[in-house]
Amino acid sequence: MSKYDSHLKCSFCGKSQEQVRKLIAGPGVYICDECVELCNEILDEELMEAPTSPVASSVSSREDRPKRRSSRDRLSLGQIPKPREIKKYLDEYVIGQNEAKKVLSVAVYNHYKRLSDIQAKRTGTGATDDPVELQKSNILLMGPTGSGKTLLAQTLAKILDVPFAVADATTLTEAGYVGEDVENILLRLLQVADLDVEEAQRGIIYIDEIDKIARKSENPSITRDVSGEGVQQALLKMLEGTVANVPPQGGRKHPYQDCIQIDTSNILFICGGAFVGLDKIVEQRLGKKSMGFIRPAEGTSKEKWSADLLKQLEPDDLVKFGMIPEFVGRIPVMASLDPLDEDALIAILTQPRNALVKQYQKLLKMDNVQLEFKSEAVRAIAQEAYRRKTGARALRGIVEELMLEVMYELPSRKDVKRCLITREMVEKRSTADLLMHPSSIPTPESA
């Protein structure tokens, strides 16, 4: 070292070169032999505690968990849930949307039958010489925000005996760019299946916000659309059926990484999105066919008119919206969800098994307080949610604002045994009177 090196220190422990045996230089930093030895000891300890590979680690950890019955053990036709049974279960959690429920129920039932047919041919219990192969029919759900698309998918996951994963299309980008590869969608399904590849290959994937990957213009651009058309291109083979290489730890793939191969031929894909503006494209097409403008019937709301237009959707309309023709062709089944009116929002507040009113009643019951909503208060909440135009999502925000002071004060008060929410309290967003005079509240007709 030169004479200028006398003040060099380790960038990690701060010891000078005179205090250590060796000081190793890097680009702008230095590390001493003691820090190198300490790092080696830490790495050795971690390697001794952890299995040798990420996949082995995941496998060993899932062996300690209760095992879920494999779909391979129960795919006889007698055990497959019927479409009516699936829809009945969805009715317990989701209000309305009967057409979408029927589409999903039939699709899931047929998915089970496809798996049963494949299993029968492999085991020799079915007609091995039958040349007919059952092809899957991927599904597209369209509807305004807050209409229940994601909730339908989440509710399906509770009843199904096959792995079910939910993914978000907005996080996906074309390979080689910042963001998630499309293979990460399969990783989620693989994790739900406890890294059982054969079980994951029988699963169902729901891709939310699929309309957000529409290309930015109808005509191809000279600039790359890495989060739009690029993602659609990457999803094509996965939707149709291909053997994909999935990195076990997620993230980007690299040449020196061990990947898990998954065949997507038997994975059912359900895509959902709001598709804002698609109704205008349908309206324009229908207007041209009728040699003029088409108008909604008198008394029809704008939301209901948009939903009626989506029921007349054709594949070309989706292409004009920004979905490439190859992508549209791989999702043959389409269903639109109806917008939620005031009556539907009231039902959502009170009727489902996980209704918001029931949730907050349970929360206050844990503090030994009975919570009651007057029927007019429930209607006022629904009216405010309808005004916000965000569907059922607005309900929780409104009720949370309304209940904030109640939930803040009640745990500290032992004199309150019952709380009543009235329409006036909803409109003024105030619960002060309720908290100050709990004993003077008369017994009302509650919702």
UniProtKB/Swiss-Prot annotation:
UniProt: Zn(2+) binding residues: C10, C13, C32, C35
Positions contributing to ATP binding: P144, T145, G146, S147, G148, K149, T150, L151
Keywords: ATP-binding, Chaperone, Metal-binding, Nucleotide-binding, Zinc
Residue pairs linked by disulfide bridges in the UniProt entry: none
MF (Gene Ontology): ATP binding; ATP hydrolysis activity; ATP-dependent protein folding chaperone; protein dimerization activity; unfolded protein binding; zinc ion binding
Positions of the ClpX-type ZB domain: 1-51
Pfam families on file: AAA_2 (PF07724), ClpB_D2-small (PF10431), zf-C4_ClpX (PF06689)
Biased segments, Low complexity type: 50-60
Cellular-component GO terms for this entry: HslUV protease complex
PROSITE patterns listed in its UniProt record: CLPX_ZB (PS51902)
Top-level taxon: Bacteria
One of the GO BP terms on file: cell division
Annotated signal sequence range: none
Annotated TM spans: none
Gene3D superfamilies, alphabetized: 1.10.8.60, ClpX chaperone, C4-type zinc finger domain, P-loop containing nucleotide triphosphate hydrolases
Region (Disordered): 50-77
Function comment: ATP-dependent specificity component of the Clp protease. It directs the protease to specific substrates. Can perform chaperone functions in the absence of ClpP.
Subunit structure: Component of the ClpX-ClpP complex. Forms a hexameric ring that, in the presence of ATP, binds to fourteen ClpP subunits assembled into a disk-like structure with a central cavity, resembling the structure of eukaryotic proteasomes.
Family designation: Belongs to the ClpX chaperone family.
NCBIfam families, per database record: clpX (TIGR00382), PRK05342.1 (NF003745)
PANTHER family: ATP-DEPENDENT CLP PROTEASE ATP-BINDING SUBUNIT CLPX-LIKE, MITOCHONDRIAL, ATP-DEPENDENT CLP PROTEASE ATP-BINDING SUBUNIT CLPX-LIKE, MITOCHONDRIAL-RELATED
Record protein name field: ATP-dependent Clp protease ATP-binding subunit ClpX
